[in-house]
Amino acid sequence: MQNQEPSQLTIKICLLAGKLILQNGGETYRVEDTMNRIAYAYGIESSHSYVTPTGIIFATDGASQITRLVRISERSTNLLKVSMVNDISRKISKGELCAEDAYRQLKDLEEKSYEYRELYKVLAAAAASGCFLIMFDGKWSDFLTVFLIGGVGFLSFLMLHRLVPVKFFAEFLTAIIIGASSSLAVYLGLGGELDKIIIGSVMPLVPGLHITNAVRDLMAGHLVSGLSKGAEAFLTAFAIGAGIATVLSFY
């Protein structure tokens, strides 16, 4: 019984670390590598992990084989949390953290949000929209218009995502709002190039991280995860395109 308890705690640490990385935008290979390194550092020499965007399976070999499953229902992007889990993992590998302290630090990390306030997110999205306008050869005279539309669009997405749990529909409705606002701005003479205004305003919604992770997982041989993330990115892009097309069909 004395040998079993540390193994149970180690498995909890591995699963919690993997869950935090996967939930906050980490790659599949990083999750598997982190879990295996933690297990090895705490004396589990042979362990196996299977990770997909919606779940983690972790198993150990030996006299008492143990298999655990954790389901991932929500995913976001918080690279600070990923970095903090990596720091904890490195301390574990160096022998600087006992199992109890590591588990407590991971639980504290799970309970804290470490997110910017929504005002900062909206301002960042608005600034990014304006910069993308210039990057795509837009006019400086449209910068303020795109700044406002991009900010309003991202704020609408945050609010709609609370009301509509399905992210696809929230993105679709947000794209409609952005398309309608852009068309209205051009109609009122507040903007010049409709296409550049729309492109700049929707860029904060584009799933760049999902596309990057999908390609990275496919290149690493994680076909299930790569295709899943690629499909999620495709649905997001389709929702944005469908929303804009809906508005332009009436323009």
Range-by-range predicted roles:
Residues 74-142, 229-240, 248:
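Alpha-helical transmembrane segments and their cytosolic membrane-interface
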Residues 105-109, 153-164, 210-223:
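C-terminal ends of transmembrane helices
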Residues 115-188:
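Core alpha-helical transmembrane segments of integral membrane proteins
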Residues 1-97:
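Soluble N-terminal domains of membrane-associated systems
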Residues 29, 101-118, 168-169, 197-200, ...:
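Cytosolic regulatory modules rich in charged/polar residues
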Residues 187-251:
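Generic detector of multi-pass transmembrane helix bundles and their immediately adjacent loops
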Residues 23, 27, 40, 44, ...:
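Generic secondary-structure signature for well-ordered alpha-helical cores
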